[in-house]
């Protein structure tokens, strides 16, 4: 059994992959903890049906958090290898000028999405809405040409609340023409997030001559879903397309499982 770890800025998501089980079994459902609650990780490890052999993970929460996670795993008899982005893995080619500068979570997420595809597939747009929002494209040639990073919905809201003298920590509904400050902030955040998706969808369509399929993930997606789907529908209609995002619960863990299954380079 191999433990899969996705250590984000706010949440720690965990799962497992068992290459020795029939059909290389996965966890029934991933489990998420607050990233500061490593006792919860230890308790979860104690519930596993088998003793894990090792762990594979990504960590964007800093060196100290990675060391604390590793110590918790070692206490359970399990060492971890932290993934780094590679120039090439699982058929996915990294287009970054310096491939290892790409966040390991983004790399694993793209590997997870690509692992779901048939050998011939359209362009893929992978959008993850966490503390940061990332939008990454995979071409039909399995090349990642680049992507965007912007503050996630909660970070945008916090920046306005704590970086200004008079704006509140907004809790409002999205509207075309907001009529109070809470609505104005909520609508601006949704517009920024949705606009980034539409921008990259249009860029992919222009680059590849066909509309990208959209995959979305992350805890911030429900907040922007309605606005994103509305703008995508309006934009797609101009090209006779109906872009419809597909939500994935744990594409980073899916990517880690795929890499572990194939013995692909991880560091």
Swiss-Prot record:
GO terms for biological process: coenzyme A biosynthetic process. GO terms for molecular function: ATP binding; pantothenate kinase activity. It comes from Bordetella pertussis (strain Tohama I / ATCC BAA-589 / NCTC 13251). PANTHER family: TYPE III PANTOTHENATE KINASE. Belongs to the type III pantothenate kinase family. Its cofactor is NH4(+); K(+). This is Type III pantothenate kinase. A monovalent cation. Ammonium or potassium. The keyword Nucleotide-binding applies. Its EC number is 2.7.1.33. Keywords: ATP-binding, Coenzyme A biosynthesis, Cytoplasm, Kinase, Nucleotide-binding, Potassium, Transcription, Transcription regulation, Transferase. Catalyzes the phosphorylation of pantothenate (Pan), the first step in CoA biosynthesis. Activates transcription of the pertussis toxin operon in a BvgAS-dependent manner. May interact with the alpha subunit of RNA polymerase. The lineage of its organism: Bacteria, Pseudomonadati, Pseudomonadota, Betaproteobacteria, Burkholderiales. InterPro entries: ATPase_NBD, Type_III_PanK. One of its GO terms (cellular component) is cytoplasm. It is found in: Cytoplasm. Homodimer. Pfam families: Pan_kinase. The active site is at residue 105. It catalyses: (R)-pantothenate + ATP = (R)-4'-phosphopantothenate + ADP + H(+). Pathway: Cofactor biosynthesis; coenzyme A biosynthesis; CoA from (R)-pantothenate: step 1/5.
